């Protein structure tokens, strides 16, 4: 292992989950938060490749868990986007910045609601104070995304119910002024419509 190639060796070791090599690189003085050409740090690569023990080792060594790559990814957002509950449970005790947003301007809860990642939504709402009414670049809240960008099925109904129970507003409209109730009814999602009505929509 040459000093010249130390950053590349370190990043590859993290991606492959080679904790001993990661620790050797750190002992040789590599910057723990060095990035590849896409802006991905070692802990981001370990997160993407589900190298959970390596993620924990890097947290313990003081890695920056909030640093985002060129497409705004970081370990917390990766866990939310990829439905990776194991990763989320490693990251949350390290106190990630819950206000970090995806390239579309949504907090981690937003894509989890859109994609139907029920276990992630439950974990976030039970164990964090993440903003349930945060509005992304296209004017949608997590509630609106849960309605508009999925199939209205059982999982989405459960997500809508959880959001409403945790303070999501049934009155916040999209950028065209349409309410969650209107959008649910337009799509024929009557079960979701009834949940919204019960919440005061």
From Swiss-Prot:
PANTHER family: ANKYRIN REPEAT AND PROTEIN KINASE DOMAIN-CONTAINING PROTEIN (PTHR24198), ANKYRIN REPEAT-CONTAINING PROTEIN-RELATED (PTHR24198:SF165). The gene is yahD. ANK repeats lie at residues 5-34, 38-67, 71-100, 104-134, 138-172, 176-201. The keyword Repeat applies. Pfam families: Ank_2. It comes from the Bacteria. The lineage of its organism: Bacteria, Pseudomonadati, Pseudomonadota, Gammaproteobacteria, Enterobacterales. GO terms for biological process: response to radiation. Disulfide bonds: none annotated. This is Putative ankyrin repeat protein YahD. Keywords: ANK repeat, Repeat.
